[in-house]
Amino acid sequence: MSGTTPDGSPGPGSSSAAIRLGTVVLDCPDPHALARFYSGLLGQPVDPDGDDDWQSLAGNGSGVVLAFQRAARHVPPSWPDGAPQQLHLDLTVQDMATAHARAIELGARPLDPEADPASDEPRRFRVYADPAGHPFCLCR
């Protein structure tokens, strides 16, 4: 349903009523370091307007920005454990072995080390932690 409601206000689906995701922010102890990690992993440049407390990647055309905010008392999430994850990123890749090697080179830590990315049996995803401990997946 789109358009207006009976009282004339914007209805669901109306562009003026839409709420859109603009930025995903990861808390971390070092925004510069985490921005460099994701810049290298995603191939997006770091926005030059950041500072010591806030860094972000330049847009990728999706309209969603990935940003990194200093949190002095950041505690990395633990995975896996009994508590549910608060958030993780699913990053789409074409070649799992190449993406795995790049993630490791940049400082990612595999969280499912029993999986072999070069195996003949294709895996649909691999789970990692970024340098600040946030979980993310590389997904086919």
Regions found by a protein language model. Give the residues of each.
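N-terminal presequences and immediately downstream first alpha-helices
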Residues: V25, R36-L57
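Surface-exposed beta-strand edges and their flanking turn/coil or helix-capping segments
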Residues: P6, S39-L41, W79-A83, R102-I104, ...
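Vicinal oxygen chelate
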Residues: S2-P29, P48-D49, S56-N60, V64, P77-R102, ...
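Acetyl-CoA-dependent GNAT
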Residues: Q69-H74
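Amphipathic alpha-helical segments
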Residues: D30-P45, A103-G107
